UniProtKB/Swiss-Prot annotation:
Region Disordered: start-end pairs: 1-26, 135-160
Molecular function GO labels: DNA binding; DNA-binding transcription factor activity; lipid binding
Main localization (coarse): nucleus
Tissue: Expressed in seedlings, roots, stems, leaf sheaths and blades and panicles.
Official protein name in the record: Homeobox-leucine zipper protein HOX9
Role noted for this protein: Probable transcription factor.
Protein family: Belongs to the HD-ZIP homeobox family. Class III subfamily.
């Protein structure tokens, strides 16, 4: 009886399910495994969750303790064990999703409650206005009640702790009324849709003083960790130059009060930087929530009176901060409010949108903070794995150093050692030198070995009708269009030697080939960190055997076609090929800032939809983001390049730097005209090719030819015509490419998946040829099938590996090529469809 009970109840204690009893295989009852047997099986499972038949046989021979178990029972045990593992992982995933949905639902309920209060308030105001209109005499009522006004809070004495505590408590109250109440009229930020896949709810102010933004979301970190990260503003806010706590004392209620001085970088050479003198109050609420609130102290004379402060305009921070509430089951709900008055009067009128747009504040500060803590949460949980085995914190530090070096060059603060040099009478390029930027010890990360210093040549220019994301992508993908390889080699050589030879002493030639290796990216691809290898070729026989490749560490911001950022950047610095963690960085690059940032408009970084991108000569009005907004888009481009120099070569390097930046400005102007929708007649800057049909016509030819040659439809609703068919082709799940039917086929068209596979854009597509994307085996397979392609009109290619435009390997399961016939039944081009492709 005891044995029978053990057999019936044993299935739950074997760690993975049992096998059939040897004594009664037909009884259908499960065997109860002993703890020793389970331990032996678990050891094997840890090494190999799915052992082969021979491996299971070997297991039975090697473990006498399993001798009484049949191979079939062992197989069933492993099957059950794998099933339980899968169920456990799925249950864990569903629990995490459920926690996120619960927290998001709580946020939405709170937001709904706030909106209901706001609606109620508006209803009362509307009723009052109707009453005023119906009874005009009430508007002139001089009774005591009608003249009641809210008394202004008296100025608090900020010179003693009790006065500061009063200010802190007022700041807390005002901040909470903004974070969870109706003190500010919040409107949803365009393009931000709440939901399980969204990183949070974002809103911007409407009709209040200054500019304000609010964000709230769920983050899988403890509240104390989140507060620690957010208080370290320079670690996540790229525009923050420094933050110094001058005074800190306890508030008496478990909180702390700090007097903080913060400096911000200037976004461009055309405006002065900002600084803040604030009180920061950190405390714990009764419900366990942590609060950090901050506001400017009255008076513009507060804070340190240093020489560097003369280069800043004092801005005001209205009650702002962070509310972090612990969440059931782990994680936290974070509320972030930024409310600033950036003194827009002090900048040229054309640049004032940068200081008068709540959306800019939302993108540069509020959502940046939320994305940063979400990024760290994912890194902490192990969800993010980066190349080269680098730790996420190290790669994040590289991004910060690249950005900080570029900001230092643009702002050129005196206390950093920068001073402006005399010009040549034409004030288009600013030349500044910095003799302090010399590495004397190994701890100075952004300096380097040279007996002189650094020359920085920088310029700013206004752009009209140039999509920022398209421009930055073009500069990234087509370096040979604007860069001089000798100048890259000059900067790179300073990392290896203590001397800085002028370019031209060892003439080099850029092969035109660059290989980009991704290192890291943020959660939503706002930033991409990568290493670029430029292949150089020596022009003299003596240098022929020496490697002349140059490696650059590069940071790209906002190049994603769906980016909604307020800043688009390409920043790079030469590095040693060994790429040590403490590599010195001399940052140079480009920054494009849209000036037409509207809180009620579409994002400046538009999505390049195919219908509007490839129309040639069409008079139809484009739809969606690619409307006339791009033709009227204004932005400011800032260029800054740094060059090391030896003291006796300072003037020569300055002249060289000025001429080089002027040549870059000319190249950028030429590129801008080429990609401008208003000038080229193409909404994405696509070059006009002789004989190239309008996009809807080409889409129809592609689908009709596919059906003609293969006898099946490429698209389910191929009967559609015009832009509807074009949109379906653009959204097709596999990569579709078209190349010219010539001796050297060049790509002329690709759908969205095709552009993603090639890692290029519609602007740069035609610079890729068919032979460049196949390796040797792929080219051989293609050439062998060309006669068959010409004879029957199509051919299937076996799965293999091809190359993207950036040199990355791409595997595909199968490819099909077919001839695309025009209206006259002549071959117009060749089309390829790559099925189930992925990066290796």
């Amino acid at each position: 009886m005891a044995a029978a009970v053990a057999m019936r109840s044993g299935s739950g204690s074997d760690g993975g399910g049992g096998g059939y009893d040897k004594a009664g295989m037909d009884s259908g009852k499960y065997v109860r495994y002993t703890p020793e047997q389970v331990e032996a099986l678990e050891r094997v499972y840890a090494e190999c969750p799915k052992p082969s038949s021979s491996r299971r046989q070997q297991l039975l021979r090697d473990c006498p303790i399993l001798a009484n178990i049949e191979p079939k029972q062992i197989k069933v045990w492993f099957q059950n064990r794998r099933c339980r593992d899968k169920q456990r992982k799925e249950a864990s995933r569903l629990q995490a999703v459920n926690r996120k949905l619960t927290a998001m639902n709580k946020l939405l309920m709170e937001e709904n409650e706030r909106l209901q209060k706001q609606v109620s308030q508006l209803v009362h105001e509307n009723a009052y206005m109707k009453q005023q209109l119906q009874n005009p005499s009430l508007g002139n009522d001089t009774s005591c009640e009608s003249n009641v006004t809210t008394p202004q809070n008296p100025l608090r004495d900020a010179s003693n702790p009790s006065g500061l505590l009063t200010i802190a408590e007022e700041t807390l109250t005002e901040f909470l009324s903004k974070a969870t109440g109706t003190a500010v009229d919040w409107v949803p930020m365009p393009g931000m849709k709440p939901g399980p896949d969204s990183f949070g709810i974002v809103a911007v102010s409407h009709g209040c003083r200054g500019v304000a933004a609010r964000a709230c979301g769920l983050v899988n970190l403890e509240p104390t960790k989140i507060v620690e990260i957010l208080k370290d503003r320079p670690s996540w806010f790229r525009d923050c130059r420094s933050l110094e706590v001058f005074t800190m004392f306890p508030a008496g209620n478990g909180g702390t009060i700090e007097l903080v001085y913060m400096q911000m970088y200037a976004p461009t050479t055309l405006v002065p930087a900002r600084d803040f003198w604030t009180l920061r109050y950190t405390t714990t609420m009764d419900d366990g929530s942590l609060v950090v609130c901050e506001r400017s102290l009255s008076g513009s004379g507060g804070g340190p009176s240093t020489a560097s402060a003369q280069q800043f305009v004092r801005a005001e921070m209205l009650p702002s901060g962070y509310l972090v509430r612990p969440c059931e089951g782990g994680g936290s709900i974070v509320h972030i409010v930024d409310h600033l008055d950036l003194e827009a009067w002090s900048v040229p009128e054309v640049l004032r949108p940068l200081y008068e747009s709540s959306r800019v504040v939302a993108q540069k500060m509020t959502t940046a903070a939320l994305r940063h803590i979400r990024q760290i949460a994912q890194e902490t949980s192990g969800e993010v794995v980066y190349a080269l085995g680098r730790q996420p914190a190290v790669l994040r530090t590289f991004s910060q150093r690249l950005s900080r070096g570029f900001n230092d060059a643009i702002s050129g603060f005196n206390d950093d050692g920068w001073s402006v040099m005399g010009g040549d009478g034409i004030e288009d390029v600013i030349i500044a030198c910095n003799a302090k930027k010399v590495r004397n010890t190994s701890t100075s990360a952004n300096a380097f070995v040279t007996p002189g210093g650094v020359i920085c040549a920088k310029a700013s220019m206004l752009l009209q009708s140039v999509p920022p994301a398209v421009l930055v992508r073009f500069l990234r993908e087509h370096r040979s269009e604007w860069a001089d390889y000798n100048f890259d080699a000059y900067s790179a050589s300073s990392l290896k030697t203590s001397s800085c030879s002028l370019p031209g002493l060892r003439p080099m030639r850029f092969s035109g080939s660059q290989i980009i290796m991704p290192l890291a990216h943020t959660v939503e691809n706002e930033e991409i960190l990568e290493v670029v290898r430029l292949e150089g070729q020596a022009l003299t026989h003596d240098d022929g055997l020496m490697s002349r490749d140059i490696h650059l560490l590069q940071l790209c911001t906002g190049i994603d076609e769906k980016s909604m950022g307020s800043c688009f950047q390409l920043v790079f610095a030469p590095i040693d090929e060994l790429f040590p963690d403490d590599a010195p960085l001399i940052s140079s690059g480009f920054r494009v800032i849209p000036l037409d940032m509207k809180t009620d408009g579409t994002p400046a970084g538009r999505t390049l939809d195919l219908a509007s991108s490839l129309e040639v000569g069409s008079t139809a009005q484009p739809t969606g983001d690619a409307s006339m907004d791009d033709c009227n888009l204004r932005s400011v481009l800032t260029i800054a390049f740094q060059f090391p120099y030896e003291m006796h070569l300072q003037d020569s390097v300055a002249t060289m730097a000025r001429q080089y930046v002027r040549s870059i400005v000319s190249s950028v102007q030429r590129v801008s005209m080429a990609i401008s929708p208003s000038r080229s007649g193409l909404n994405a800057g696509q070059k006009i090719i002789s004989g190239f049909p309008e996009a809807p016509t080409l889409a129809r030819w592609i689908c009709q030819s596919y059906q003609f040659h293969l006898g099946v439809e490429l698209l389910r609703q191929a009967d559609d015509a015009g832009e509807a068919l074009l949109k379906m082709l653009w959204d097709y799940e596999d990569a579709i490419l078209c190349c010219s039917f010539k001796e050297k086929p060049v790509f002329t068209f690709a759908n969205e998946m095709g552009l993603n596979m090639l890692e290029t854009s519609l602007v740069a597509l035609q610079d890729l040829s068919l032979d460049k994307i196949f390796d040797e085996a792929g080219r051989k397979a293609l050439y062998n099938e060309i006669p068959k392609l010409m004879e029957q009109g199509y051919v299937y290619l076996p799965g293999g590996v091809c190359l993207s435009g950036m040199g990355r390997h791409v595997s595909f399961e199968q490819a099909v090529a077919w001839k695309v016939l025009g209206e006259d039944n002549n071959v117009h081009c060749l089309a390829f469809c790559f099925v189930n492709w992925s990066f290796v």
